[in-house]
């Protein structure tokens, strides 16, 4: 069974989002990730090993390690990769 681990940075990012519709879409994307962990776009360069899914207008960045999914960041697409 896959285990989900939330980073502190991810939790802080989610708290900043006030739009409930965005949070609901984010939850649906997390459910999709649980069903198929490789659904996200693989990232490159210094973010190699991480994946990203789009939750308009945000990006959810996560990493899959063994049977664990680490939710790393949930930020606006303009500054998520900084």
Go through each PLM region and give its residues.
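A short alpha-helix capping/helix-coil boundary motif
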Residues: 7-10, 28-29, 38
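Short, well-structured alpha-helical segments
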Residues: 23, 27-31
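A short, surface-exposed loop/turn module that caps and links secondary-structure elements
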Residues: 30-54
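Enriched for short, Lys/Arg-rich terminal
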Residues: 1-12, 16, 20-24, 55-59, ...
């Amino acid at each position: 069974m896959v285990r989900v681990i939330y980073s502190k940075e991810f939790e802080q990012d989610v708290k900043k989002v006030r739009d409930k519709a965005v949070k609901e879409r984010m939850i649906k994307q997390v459910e999709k990730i649980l069903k198929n962990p490789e659904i996200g776009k693989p990232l490159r360069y210094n973010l190699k090993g991480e994946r990203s899914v789009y939750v308009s207008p945000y990006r959810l960045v996560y990493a899959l390690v063994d049977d664990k999914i680490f939710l790393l960041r949930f930020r606006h697409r303009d500054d998520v990769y900084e």
